[in-house]
Design a protein with these regions (language model features):
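C-terminal alpha-helical interaction appendages
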Residues: 2-90
Length: 90
């Protein structure tokens, strides 16, 4: 199943990006990752890819794979960024 999901080639990535993500999410992911220190970006990219692949592999219906994987990985990233910068929003 994962064989069908090809990683986004480095030449098509926006700077330091996760290995797997939906191309339509690239500007949003790039903007969120841009708020992080460079030392933390690689770790967050790996976590995003892991979240994306976990849901991709678990979803039995092929037409739902990208949608569910996007939702899960993007939600995790949004919550992480929100918690990380919550102290500045008070």
């Amino acid at each position: 199943m994962v064989d069908e999901l090809k990683p986004v080639p480095p030449s098509k990535r926006w700077g330091q990006m996760p290995r797997h993500y939906h191309p339509d999410d690239a500007p949003w992911i790039s903007a969120k990752l841009g708020t992080l220190d460079p030392s933390l970006r690689a770790e967050v990219c790996a976590a995003y890819t892991k979240a994306y692949l976990e849901v991709w592999e678990a979803e039995p219906l092929s037409y739902r794979k990208h949608g569910k994987a996007r939702f899960s990985a993007n939600t995790r990233l949004r919550v992480f960024i929100g918690k990380r910068f919550a102290v500045f929003n008070r």
